[in-house]
C-alpha cells in the first residue's frame, strides 16, 4: 500500500467561491499553512460537478484548481443527507439553493419534502464532508467526515451558512448556526474530515 503524500509548502489554494466555507477551512488549517488564496481570489472557474459522490466532486474541484493555479489545492464537497428523503439533497445540496445560492429557499424545500414524505425515519439527517487535496501533477488524497443529527424548523441562528440553521448535531440542543464557531469547528462533519486529512497529509 502506497503511503499518503504529505503537504509541503506554505501556500494552499482553497478551491471554493463560498466565503463562509473558505473562512472555516482557513481557520481549521491555520496552524499548518500560511497563505490561503481562494479560487474566487485567483479568478479560477467553477468546474461543473459531474461526479456521483461527495469524494468524486471534491477531487474534481481540487484537481481543476491545482492544474489552473500550479499550486496544491484543497476542495470540499459537502452536503446534507436526509434519511427520509433517501439521502437528498445530498450531492445536490448547493444546487437546491439555485444560482442565487438562496439557502433559505433550499431549507424550505427540505421542510416541504420532509412533510410530504411522512417517513418513519422522521427528521434524522447527517452532514457529509469530503475533502480532496490535489497537486498540479494530478495526485489526490481524499477523506470523508460525517456528523449525525436531526432537523428542526423554522431555521434558527445566524452564525453559520448553508443548511446550518436547521441542523441540530447529536448531543446538542442548538443548531449549527446557534453554536459558537469554535465549538462548531470542533464537532462538525468538516472537523471530522479535517482530523483525518491532518493525520494523513499534514502530521
From Swiss-Prot:
InterPro entries: dITP/XTP_pyrophosphatase, ITPase-like_fam, RdgB/HAM1. One of its GO terms (biological process) is purine nucleoside triphosphate catabolic process. Disulfide bonds: none annotated. Its EC number is 3.6.1.66. Belongs to the HAM1 NTPase family. One of its GO terms (molecular function) is nucleotide binding. Keywords: Hydrolase, Magnesium, Metal-binding, Nucleotide metabolism, Nucleotide-binding. Mg(2+) binds at residues 48, 77. It catalyses: XTP + H2O = XMP + diphosphate + H(+); dITP + H2O = dIMP + diphosphate + H(+); ITP + H2O = IMP + diphosphate + H(+). Pyrophosphatase that catalyzes the hydrolysis of nucleoside triphosphates to their monophosphate derivatives, with a high preference for the non-canonical purine nucleotides XTP (xanthosine triphosphate), dITP (deoxyinosine triphosphate) and ITP. Seems to function as a house-cleaning enzyme that removes non-canonical purine nucleotides from the nucleotide pool, thus preventing their incorporation into DNA/RNA and avoiding chromosomal lesions. This is dITP/XTP pyrophosphatase. Its cofactor is Mg(2+). PANTHER family: INOSINE TRIPHOSPHATE PYROPHOSPHATASE, INOSINE TRIPHOSPHATE PYROPHOSPHATASE/HAM1 PROTEIN. Binds 1 Mg(2+) ion per subunit. Substrate binds at residues 16-21, 78, 161-164, 184, 189-190. Homodimer. Coiled coil: none annotated. The active site is at 77 (proton acceptor). GO terms for cellular component: cytosol. The lineage of its organism: Bacteria, Pseudomonadati, Pseudomonadota, Alphaproteobacteria, Rhodospirillales. The keyword Hydrolase applies.
